[in-house]
Amino acid sequence: DALHLTKSTVSRALNGYPDISEATQLRVKRMAERMNYQPLSHAQAIKTGRTRSLGFVLQLADHDAQRPFLAEFLAGLSAGSTAQGYTLTVASADSETHLIETFRTLLRERKADGFILPRAMVSDPRVELLRSAKVPFVLFGRQADPEGCCWFDIRGEDAMQEAVMHLSELGHRRIGFINGGTIYSYAKLRGEGFRAGMAQAGMAVDPDLICENAVTLDDGREAAALLLKLAHPPTAIVCAVDQVALGVYLAAADLGITIGRELSVVGYDGIQEGAHAQPPLTTFAVDNRAAGVELATLLVKCIGGEPSENLRKTANAAFVRRGSTGPCINL
């Protein structure tokens, strides 16, 4: 009554419906805070058909599951959800088959109003399932077919291009590239960025210096060993992920090669292990907490009915120059 609004308008304002102006929503929410009003979530779910929960399914078999970034990412998702008046529902799956089964169960039981999908895939069964079910979702990564897709992504392709230019300015001409898992959208984009950097620097890409599908420390060690044992090995290696770059350190140590002097290495992610490596790893750092907040915010807007084409954002990784890159001494 104090706001001179109908009960229906107040309800729609509290639930973030797009037909209610932002100014009205803000007035209603401020009054609700002053009156210490908290809607009963169960009753609200019955009335609106919404759970006010965002879903996130963690694939335990994935190489990211134990990585430090996950804690920051989940903290961001949780903070972003809470800021929008939502909770975060986290489920887990131990295989790709179980992953889709888990999504089907969550959909059937209406456990969430929408889903955050980490690590977008080139052919993504999660996207196909949620599209067909007409359930809102947001991707951490991009899709070639954007229909119905909201996303937030870091422009890894720009980072790879910048990495090549950095190495070129240091005099490197034989630059290797160890890409990530080709099932993921990021690998295609980062590969394109590497090639764009080589073209910009006026250098041809040597296919013998390209490796694909490396995502772990061991993958990086194995790929780098192949490159470094060539008759004409690279003087620098760009890696699509930091874990792989740290694997390059191991391969170099195996062969008695000094990182930063005889071989330059650039990574991508900004994990703490890279900062503590000897020498510290030159990389492109990603703020995973901020990404989590952004994804949750976009998903709530999508749930509220905002068109998906208005909910696609990208940001840049931050270049962190450290001791793993230096002038080429093999001119």
Give the location of each predicted region.
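Amphipathic helical "hinge" segments at domain boundaries
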Residues: 26, 35-102, 199
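N-terminal helix-turn-helix DNA-binding module of bacterial transcription factors
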Residues: 1-52
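Hinge/beta->alpha junction and helix N-cap segments in small-molecule ligand-binding domains
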Residues: 60-72, 90-99, 152-162, 178-223, ...
